[in-house]
């Protein structure tokens, strides 16, 4: 576990995104933070913009099969990511294309913004090679901000309803539970960068919140199994 911030903001999930084999970070991150995050997540880091923006966590997501980014990405940015990642980078089509905000995914499935077009859903299915379902989470359409997923669990907005949790469990094939980050903030996807072996959380996150995060996302299980 690593507590961190970007330019004083504890919403680390807005500015960084971890897939199975690469950590994407905003381009102006300091070297110490980049190195610490890469070490915690045990994956190489790429400091970059996406579409000229530093909000790379909001604009990108991925799993073991591929990475999805906003269609505003430049060729130079795509090449920078693909140089380090072992998978291809695909642009999410349509007007709702902040991939990190609108897609919640792991290696088993994806749960996405309810208004994504059929073309966008098909693009996600192809890029990530998983089944896709549309839905909301606690009335939040940007489901990637309202939850964070690993291959062991999904931590969701504290006002998520039971049918929503069940839908996420069905489509991502892991247990889902509720929690908060950064001393009570409900948009947990904006405050956590979750990898398969470790995670980075906003610096304002409390001890009880950390316990819920580690239990729900499977880090306690991982430690026990070791």
From Swiss-Prot:
Q: Which GO terms describe its molecular function?
A: ribosome binding; translation initiation factor activity
Q: Which source organism?
A: Haloquadratum walsbyi (strain DSM 16790 / HBSQ001)
Instruction: List the SMART domains.
Output: eIF6 (SM00654)
Return the PANTHER family for the record. TRANSLATION INITIATION FACTOR 6
Family listed:
Belongs to the eIF-6 family.
Task: Describe its function.
Answer: Binds to the 50S ribosomal subunit and prevents its association with the 30S ribosomal subunit to form the 70S initiation complex.
Question: Which InterPro entries has this protein been placed in?
Answer: eIF6
Disulfide pairs? none
Which key words tag this protein in UniProt? Initiation factor, Protein biosynthesis
Q: What is this protein called?
A: Translation initiation factor 6
Q: Which GO terms describe its biological process?
A: cytosolic ribosome assembly
Q: Which HAMAP family match?
A: eIF_6
